Amino acid sequence: MAGEIVHFEVPAADPDRASGFWGGLFGWKIGGSAMEGFDYRMFQVGEGLGGAVMPSEKAGSGVIIYYDTDDIDAAVAKVRELGGTADEKQPVPTHGWFAACTDTEGNPFSLWQGDSNAA
């Protein structure tokens, strides 16, 4: 459903420490990466909602929330029309597309469109 929160990322300077913190706090079972060669530690927190701890130099900048959309191209255009910024969509092969965005106040978020044919 468009606008539903489907994923979030926790940027971490030390992914081991962050995984231990969030796993310990909520009992989340944080696993290894689903993508070879990329340290992206995924977990599920509820029905259909997942997250990941990922290494980042921007640790401390806040959690990135991903919002579902049925048409990522139209959503990117709408973000720009409303005064936000949006990068071009990027593929997550065999999973879907995402676009990194900011709202009019500079708050980061991302758009997501599932697509098993993304490449």
Locate predicted features.
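N-terminal beta-strand motif that seeds the catalytic metal site of vicinal oxygen chelate
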Residues: 1-19, 63-65, 114-119
